[in-house]
Each structure stands twice: as structure tokens, then as C-alpha cells.
Amino acid sequence: MIPGEVFCAEGVIELNEGAPRTELDVVNTGDRPVQVGSHVHFPQANHALQFDRSAAHGLRLDIPAGTAVRFEPGIAQTVVLVPLRGTREVHGLSLTPPGKLDAS
């Protein structure tokens, strides 16, 4: 074994297995491409992206960690979102006020 080496189990690994999924249509109304990373709280994505932000509350893209989706200007596309997990707190983006996503 090499230090840091990871051995995965045989078979297919399903990302976000069992997580509820939400599909939303998104259009980039800006004049430049926009990329959104895998763990961005989707409603906080660039405001040139037009979609139902309230339906996306507490959700992120259903894509592998460290990847992103690129939205070209004027092009509509459908994305699949899954709930943010863990403590469900978002800090350092545009959430006003930052912090817990769910009411306490």
C-alpha cells in the first residue's frame, strides 16, 4: 500500500444515494459564462442565473465533489439538486444572514 492510497469496494458507487432530488430549469441571462461548483448553496449562485431560488433553498448540485456546471449565456438547461447535508450551515457567501439553513 502506498501512503494515502485508497482502495474502493468493487462495483458501482452511487453519489448521494437515497437523497431526494429536485430538478430545476436554469437560464443564464448574463453575457458571460457562469460556473457553479459542487457544494455551492444553489440559491446563492450568480444572480445572472434565472431559476426558482426559493425551490432551491438548502440544495446544491448533484455532481461529484470538486466539479462544476457551466452555464453559457442565453442557454437554458435543467439541473438536478440534492440537499446540503451535515450541519446545514452556510457561511461566507451571500446568504443574509449567514448561518443555519433550517429554522431552529
Curated annotation (Swiss-Prot):
Enzyme kind, highest EC tier: hydrolase
Reaction(s) the record says it catalyses: urea + 2 H2O + H(+) = hydrogencarbonate + 2 NH4(+)
Pfam families the record matches: Urease_beta (PF00699)
Source species, domain of life: Bacteria
EC number: 3.5.1.5
UniProt KW keywords: Cytoplasm, Hydrolase
Bilayer-crossing regions: none
GO cellular component: urease complex
Pathway where it operates: Nitrogen metabolism; urea degradation; CO(2) and NH(3) from urea (urease route): step 1/1
Subcellular compartments: Cytoplasm
Main location (coarse class): cytoplasm
Gene Ontology biological process terms in this record: urea catabolic process
A single GO molecular function term of this UniProt record: urease activity
Assembly behavior: Heterotrimer of UreA (gamma), UreB (beta) and UreC (alpha) subunits. Three heterotrimers associate to form the active enzyme.
HAMAP family recorded: Urease_beta
Similarity annotation: Belongs to the urease beta subunit family.
Protein known as: Urease subunit beta
Species for this entry: Rhodococcus opacus (strain B4)
